Amino acid sequence: MIAKPIYMQGEGDGEDGGTNRGTSVITRVKPKTKRPNLYRVLLLNDDYTPMEFVIHILERFFQKDREAATRIMLHVHQHGVGECGVFTYEVAETKVSQVMDFARQHQHPLQCVMEKK
């Protein structure tokens, strides 16, 4: 937290007839906010999920254009894992859940996970 002093002049009998008690300091505390942790959402390669389905997932849930989705899909296919995006915890958790549910509904074994960046 950051303390920022506020100065106030005293009232009372001083040279001008008041009791000048000097200057008071009131400290106002400004809370310092911390940036939220970020999480990478990753797709894992498998031998059964069609490439076109992976592209569809990337377009639908991660708002990737066709070219970017194809590039990520090929990276997943060649390297076994690929990053779909980086999000706060709650958003990453939601994306993983959406992808996993959608894959199960379409009977694909596609795996989607998140890891702290």
Swiss-Prot record:
Checking InterPro entries in the record gives: ClpS (IPR022935), ClpS_core (IPR003769), Ribosomal_bL12_C/ClpS-like (IPR014719)
Q: Name one Pfam family in it.
A: ClpS
Cystines in this chain: none
A biological process (GO) of this protein is: protein catabolic process
In UniProt terms, what function does this protein have? Involved in the modulation of the specificity of the ClpAP-mediated ATP-dependent protein degradation.
As for family, the record states: Belongs to the ClpS family.
NCBIfam families the UniProt entry points to: PRK00033.1-2 (NF000669), PRK00033.1-5 (NF000672)
Subunit annotation: Binds to the N-terminal domain of the chaperone ClpA.
HAMAP family per record = ClpS (MF_00302)
Q: What is this protein called?
A: ATP-dependent Clp protease adapter protein ClpS 1
| Species of provenance | Agrobacterium fabrum (strain C58 / ATCC 33970) (Agrobacterium tumefaciens (strain C58))
